[in-house]
Amino acid sequence: DLDGRTNILNLNAIGETACTGLHGANRLASTSLLECLTSAHFTALADSQDIARKAFSLPQPRLWESPPEEADPTLIAQDLDLVQQTMWNYAGIVRSPRRLTRARRILHEAREEIRSFYRRCRVTPELIELRNAVRSALLVVHAASLNPRSKGAHYVINERR
């Protein structure tokens, strides 16, 4: 409707997604912006009225128990260093299929160790950083494995000996 309500309770839509037909079929960028601002204004007014008469409430989040164990900061720092050194040594500027294979193996082991941290330890920003680092490293190694050519700043060595 013109207040942005949808058929899903407590979900509003504004702008073109609201399908108000405010400007008809002539869709210009300038009218789309105007429609967005206008519908947002009316939706906000309707929402404030709903909140004032308590017709709207946020669901309470479910509580869960956080694991009591904290991950050892030394282990997290060491694993992060392992990821960085692995990338530097095996997936750096000079690459080879053998080095990339070794990097992949090391990173897969690290990923499993980090998964065990997640299962038994409280999640911290450092643990999230470590998880993201190993995921990113695995993506880089995978992409590098798919590119056998020397291109840009990376040089692929041929290991025929």
Where on the chain are the PLM-derived regions?
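Glycine- and aromatic-enriched mobile tails/lids
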Residues: D1-A13, T17-R161
